[in-house]
């Protein structure tokens, strides 16, 4: 057990330590959502921790006491990929990634308080996850998902025959999606049953593919779909799943449906909200999500957008009666927030939903029959909600969340009452020592069209009488936000503790401040958002005396990377000592190489060939803009980023080099739009922070700050001089 002490949070901090470093950030324990047992006594959650010395990330599962917040170890077996409660909560079902079937997984059942007392119920012949269970007579029906072959079988990569050629042949889109070339396999929801034999359950290995009979359907939908894309009714008889509209071009439209199908697959799944269908509200043809059955299984709630090619449209709650032809009802449809998840109370009368509101992921409640103009009520909690589960049959929920100052917040929330803290990681993990809400504050500034929100993040040991260089961080999306939440990639506190004050703006295009602000970036990427950023920068310069804008830096990823490239060619670009652009577009016309065409065709008001002027308007490579470039810039782009090609980053670096501007190109051949592998993440931080520290002067003022020379990777430089030295 000694080797797994990290599984249980430390009771006290070490007596001394450095500020929050990239090593602390990457190696801090990472905890998953806490799922309570049916009695409301314990919750189980996954935890892992990266070890830089051993270059591995062992993991395990813990139990959280819901009365006092105490944590105990359930298992240290890293092969246990997921756990769910069985029956009254005295037992658990878990999936083990090692199995006698090569490439398959085992389904095991164990006592919740004696994990070693486990038995194997059966094997699944392929990768399988996302278990959901429901009692059905003397059986336990379940659903989960895996990859399907074209014939409908569960795909087993280990058993697959090696192709005679590496060729890929396409007659339609997608060719690539996010980080993967699309193949013949696709995601599908499968159903099965655990049969009781005496006091044990067994699984015969038989699964029914519920998705494959619907041609061109796929669920969960990649790249981010998971178990939230489907649900199993409480009686175990009916399954709901979300799929993009099978009859429509998936790369061009976001339309998706909620399908209903018997658990045994005896009928082909049918959509309840088909576009222009008899039950579907008029004009509603956008993306659907989060299907969930009412406790009695007679109704199903889900979320849906209206617009068919807009991934950031406002979601509205919908409720449909199961087995009925009655029209689908829209709930609180005038609420100017976009719900992200929905659940029913145990009596089926109240809906609990999460939604982003003013840069915080909040929990709300509303009646299940709420009228259009109803405004949901906020449930008090700290930080942002990642997930929530009801505690027994009560109105209280167990919230798993995080914030800008802690990567795990477990708390109990009850409508109309103060929240009750169970476990906050920053109060226990040595790596997070000193982090807290005291160093975070909001900033509101008059922007181009309305007031714009930003977060100010201060370093450990902040002194208002001192001056700190500005780190101006621009979020991606563009329909996204800097929220009061923890990022495992771009974490403002890591930047601040190099010796900066971070300002993280939420300009035009950001989510959580009303749909108009989100929509207003359409065909205006370099317009209002840029003006917002200028006004925020000017406000900081003129009114916040502890921030040094003369030695500030700007950095961003994705849309934030585009904005940094845009800023390089604008007056604001001359105000920074250094720039960092991660996976940002450079040449306007290159956007046609992206994967999800609906994204660019919405944001630029037309197709690449019919509205070319809109794509060209915000082209960072225009000669008149490039002529203004002079600020040192770090460019980052990865080979498996299929949102926008690595050629974008290479082209940007080429121009910087030919212009003789101090610049560096950082590339990870095994990373995507994001950098997620621990050792790569450390190098990323060493390069990014080392770059800005060099040009901002932090290396001189803070001897402990990261330097470019701290990175062990050899720099490739085959040229002794710049092109313009000759």
Curated annotation (Swiss-Prot):
Gene Ontology cellular-component annotations: extracellular region
Gene that produces this protein: DPPV
Presence of the UniProt keyword Signal in the record: yes
GO biological process: proteolysis
InterPro entries associated with the record: 6-blade_b-propeller_TolB-like (IPR011042), AB_hydrolase_fold (IPR029058), PD40 (IPR011659), Peptidase_S9_cat (IPR001375)
EC number in record: 3.4.14.-
Top-level taxon: Eukaryota
Family membership noted in the UniProt record: Belongs to the peptidase S9C family.
Pfam families: PD40 (PF07676), Peptidase_S9 (PF00326)
Protein name: Dipeptidyl-peptidase 5
Location(s), subcellular: Secreted
Enzyme class: hydrolase
Keyword Glycoprotein among UniProt keywords: yes
Cleavable signal peptide: 1-19
Ranges for region Disordered: 269-291
Gene3D superfamilies on file: alpha/beta hydrolase, TolB, C-terminal domain
């Amino acid at each position: 057990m000694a080797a797994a002490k990290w599984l249980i949070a430390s009771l006290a901090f070490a007596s001394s330590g450095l500020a929050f470093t990239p090593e602390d950030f990457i190696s801090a324990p990472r905890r998953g959502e806490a799922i309570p047992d049916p009695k409301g006594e314990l919750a189980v959650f996954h935890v892992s921790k990266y070890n830089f010395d051993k270059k591995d990330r062992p993991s395990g599962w813990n139990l959280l006491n819901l009365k006092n917040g105490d944590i105990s170890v359930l298992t240290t077996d890293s092969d246990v990929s997921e756990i769910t409660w069985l029956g009254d909560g005295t037992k658990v079902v878990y999936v083990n990634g090692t199995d006698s079937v090569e490439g398959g997984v085992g389904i095991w059942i164990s006592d919740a308080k004696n994990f070693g007392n486990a038995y194997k119920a059966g094997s699944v012949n392929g990768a399988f996850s996302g278990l959901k269970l429901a009692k059905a007579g003397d059986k336990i029906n379940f659903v989960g998902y895996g990859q399907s072959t074209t014939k409908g079988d569960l795909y087993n990569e280990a058993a697959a025959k090696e192709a005679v050629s590496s060729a890929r042949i396409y007659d339609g889109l997608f060719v690539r999606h996010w980080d993967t070339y699309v193949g013949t396999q696709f995601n599908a929801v499968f159903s099965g049953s655990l049969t009781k034999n005496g006091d044990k359950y067994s699984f015969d290995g038989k699964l029914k593919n519920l998705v494959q009979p619907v041609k061109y359907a796929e669920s969960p939908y990649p790249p981010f779909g998971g178990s939230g894309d489907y649900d199993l009714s409480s009686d175990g008889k009916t399954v709901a799943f979300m799929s993009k509209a099978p009859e429509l071009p998936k790369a061009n439209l976001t339309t998706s449906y909620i399908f209903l199908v018997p658990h045994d697959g005896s009928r082909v799944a049918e959509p309840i909200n088909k576009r222009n269908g008899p039950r579907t509200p008029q004009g509603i043809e956008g993306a659907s999500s989060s299907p969930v059955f009412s406790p009695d299984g007679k109704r199903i709630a889900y979320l849906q957008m209206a617009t068919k090619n807009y991934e950031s449209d406002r979601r509205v709650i919908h409720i449909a009666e199961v087995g009925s032809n009655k029209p689908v009802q829209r709930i609180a449809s005038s609420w100017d927030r976009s719900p992200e998840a929905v659940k029913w109370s145990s009596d089926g009368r109240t809906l609990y939903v999460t939604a982003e509101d003013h840069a915080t992921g909040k929990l709300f409640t509303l009646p299940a029959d709420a009228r259009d103009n109803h405004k949901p009520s906020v449930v008090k909690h700290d930080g942002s909600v990642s997930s929530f589960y009801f505690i027994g049959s009560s109105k209280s929920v167990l919230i798993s969340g995080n914030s800008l100052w802690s990567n795990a917040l477990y708390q109990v929330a009850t409508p109309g009452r103060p929240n009750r803290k169970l476990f906050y990681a920053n109060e226990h993990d040595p790596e997070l020592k000193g982090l807290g809400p005291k160093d975070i504050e909001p900033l509101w500034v008059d922007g181009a069209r309305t007031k714009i929100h930003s977060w100010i993040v201060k370093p450990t040991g902040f002194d208002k009488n001192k001056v700190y260089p500005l780190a101006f961080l621009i979020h991606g999306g563009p329909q996204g936000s800097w929220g009061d939440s923890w990022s495992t990639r771009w974490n403002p506190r890591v930047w601040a503790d190099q010796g900066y004050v971070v300002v993280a703006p939420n300009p035009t295009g950001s989510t959580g401040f009303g749909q108009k602000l989100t929509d207003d970036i359409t065909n205006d990427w370099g317009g209002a958002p840029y003006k917002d950023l200028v006004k925020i920068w000017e406000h900081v310069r003129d009114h916040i005396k502890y921030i040094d804008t003369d030695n500030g830096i700007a950095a961003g990823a994705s849309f934030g990377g585009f904005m940094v490239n845009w800023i390089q060619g604008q007056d604001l670009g001359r105000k920074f000592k250094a720039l960092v652009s991660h996976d940002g577009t450079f040449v306007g016309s290159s956007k046609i190489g992206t994967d999800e065409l609906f994204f660019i065709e919405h944001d630029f008001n037309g197709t690449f060939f019919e509205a070319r002027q809109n794509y060209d308007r915000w082209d960072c490579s225009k000669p008149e803009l490039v002529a203004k470039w002079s600020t040192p810039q770090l460019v980052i782009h990865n080979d498996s980023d299929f949102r926008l090609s690595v050629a974008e980053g290479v082209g940007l670096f080429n121009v910087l080099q030919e212009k003789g501007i101090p610049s560096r190109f950082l590339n990870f051949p095994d990373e995507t739009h994001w950098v997620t592998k621990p050792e790569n993440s450390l190098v990323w931080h060493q390069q990014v922070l080392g770059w800005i520290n060099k040009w901002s002067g932090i290396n001189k003022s803070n001897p402990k700050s990261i330097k470019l020379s701290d990175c062990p990777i050899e720099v490739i430089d085959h040229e002794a001089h710049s092109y313009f030295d000759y």
